[in-house]
Amino acid sequence: MSSAIKEVQGAPVKWVTNWTPEAIRGLVDQEKGLLDPRIYADQSLYELELERVFGRSWLLLGHESHVPETGDFLATYMGEDPVVMVRQKDKSIKVFLNQCRHRGMRICRSDAGNAKAFTCSYHGWAYDIAGKLVNVPFEKEAFCDKKEGDCGFDKAEWGPLQARVATYKGLVFANWDVQAPDLETYLGDARPYMDVMLDRTPAGTVAIGGMQKWVIPCNWKFAAEQFCSDMYHAGTTTHLSGILAGIPPEMDLSQAQIPTKGNQFRAAWGGHGSGWYVDEPGSLLAVMGPKVTQYWTEGPAAELAEQRLGHTGMPVRRMVGQHMTIFPTCSFLPTFNNIRIWHPRGPNEIEVWAFTLVDADAPAEIKEEYRRHNIRNFSAGGVFEQDDGENWVEIQKGLRGYKAKSQPLNAQMGLGRSQTGHPDFPGNVGYVYAEEAARGMYHHWMRMMSEPSWATLKP
């Protein structure tokens, strides 16, 4: 056990306020499956996260269909930094800091819409849709030398900070770090598992039902880890009542069984992970109903998806109930087709942004089924959403204590059992009820926090 985690019963904890790389590396022991609880509750660690994780990772902002036309925008966040995602005249997408360069006021105060320009409501500095400063009130009178006629103020130098932007099959990501690897390299061997939802048809995907937002008083890593690695909670106690309530009335509840067949994937690099059931459609039926279940597992759409993704070797029609996280805060549920962004709000709170994604050429009836069932199950008041939120909130409450942060947490399930060479699924794969992907996520978190240079951190 690493020295930073090791705790002799009754001995004092060594609290760290200046987190050195060595101290950070001691917070996560992937070889023994141990986590220091302070990673969820320490303010100074969180401040480092904003710089070293959220300042260097590819972060999901939304879907291309959120900004279909020139001037369409979505105001969102990268970490705690407000940004604007805008469709350009050439149909590209730009992302820039939602901050006026004069006194720092937001230049866009609407959640979404269409604009020809963005004007700061404080002093009226105006920016075009590319983020270029185009108008400053009293520019000549206030900034120029009237006697010499020389104006040392150059508007071209005072646009908001621009982020790198890249898309993957409809999803829009951005990154502040010019040294970070490109998006496809960053996603790495997780891409086939993303494609199960994103690339089922040549028509691609479309976001429906708007963006739902709510706040949960918990650390962002609890949410990210659950979608990365934790089928365990769904197969034990957390969601059983909701699943049983969704079983069709004609079925005999005494015959209901917890799924036992499935797998989990850990990315070779990057902290990404996924899990899914195989040949266990009962959970999908209980959550999404018979129409969505049939659409995903049978018929022309399912056959097309399996053919289209045949190069992966994965039996995509047999994969149900999938969960996935692209580190750090992009999470989604293929088959349920719900996407989440966990915006951090300090070490003890997240703002959840969620939307539903469907095949663009799916029948209207199927799109409506997805929309309706996602509201019922995965909205702020959804059947399963309330279960998850309650668990995360209660954990975070406990971490206010001194002793609660002094005992290492167990992440040992399936330790050493995952391996490459699975006959159906690519990459490092193990049993569905495991924590290999969680260990990968926390190990990558530890590396990003302790390795400032991409020379050592890169894939």
From Swiss-Prot:
Keywords: 2Fe-2S, Aromatic hydrocarbons catabolism, Dioxygenase, Iron, Iron-sulfur, Metal-binding, NAD, Oxidoreductase. It comes from the Bacteria. One of its GO terms (molecular function) is iron ion binding. PROSITE patterns: RIESKE, RING_HYDROXYL_ALPHA. It catalyses: biphenyl + NADH + O2 + H(+) = (2R,3S)-3-phenylcyclohexa-3,5-diene-1,2-diol + NAD(+). [2Fe-2S] cluster binds at C100, H102, C120, H123. The keyword NAD applies. Pfam families: Rieske, Ring_hydroxyl_A. SUPFAM superfamilies: Bet v1-like (SSF55961), ISP domain (SSF50022). Binds 1 [2Fe-2S] cluster per subunit. Fe cation binds at H233, H239. Its cofactor is [2Fe-2S] cluster; Fe cation. Heterohexamer consisting of three BphA subunits and three BphE subunits. A ferredoxin (BphF) and a ferredoxin reductase (BphG) must be present to obtain activity. Belongs to the bacterial ring-hydroxylating dioxygenase alpha subunit family. This is Biphenyl dioxygenase subunit alpha. It comes from Paraburkholderia xenovorans (strain LB400). The lineage of its organism: Bacteria, Pseudomonadati, Pseudomonadota, Betaproteobacteria, Burkholderiales. The gene is bphA.
